[in-house]
Amino acid sequence: GDTGKVKPFGQKDNGGDLVETAFLIQGLLAVHQYYVNGNEKEKALAQRIDQIWRDVDWNWYRQGGQNVLYWHWSPTYGWEMNFPVHGYNECMIMYILAAASPTHGVPAAVYHDGWAQNGAIVSPHKVEGIELHLRYQGTEAGPLFWAQYSFLGLDPVGLKDEYCPSYFHEMRNLTLVNRAYCIRNPKHYKGFGPDCWGLTASYSVDGYAAHSPNEQEDKGVISPTAALSSIVYTPEYSMQVMRHLYSMRDKVFGPFGFYDAFSETDNWYPQRYLAIDQGPIAVMIENYRSGLLWKLFMSHPDVQQGLRK
């Protein structure tokens, strides 16, 4: 909106949302780096972004100094949502930025104790015969936005820590699990296969759902953003899906690209877009093509300091 007021996502979710704030800041820091050495108007924009970045109080979301970050805080309900964020899921970028903040930064222990759960985030296992190294919250292998949202700016290539020897390899394998599950197609949905895979959070046949590669959370809905935003991990397989979807363009393609989701089984082709799904397609295609957004975000000195921390 144009008022700056919060639009409640739910009754008690009517205040600060640190995860979504982190996604916003990730993008803004890339924009900052693009304009910081430009003309006077561009430099002024970069300065405004820098002020927003410095104003985010990451430390507040430790709820009294705990070594974990909480997702929500409400001016009317306080901490009643009570959602401490542990890994692994889409929220890694929140912990990276919280460590990187020059004004309201958190100590490294918040990452190690909260996100990594003192090492419990490490849980080597196989899904669809493919090796995964991390523990995925509530599931053996999560939806594909878990491999994408934190890495729109944060470059997974060469990124590692004591819990994961290669975040790029881990996210690639998470993507391959999703593809392999869709090819196996245990619920026998129409259309699923090597050229039509990709389960993630999107519009769904019954509203909105975080579709995942398991029989409980697979509703037969393909979300184009899932495979297309995976192009940095699986370029050939993602292009295979893109070509197939384009051959179905009368049903799944519109003025702003591929629609958010569809189900051949249910003959469900809603001509709707969802910005948080559309955005990663463009960003990840450009990262695959040139690495532009990765280079911009990773060049920010605060980000580098946070990663070293």
Residue ranges and their predicted role:
Residues 1-309:
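Ser/Thr/Asn(+Pro)-rich, low-complexity disordered segments
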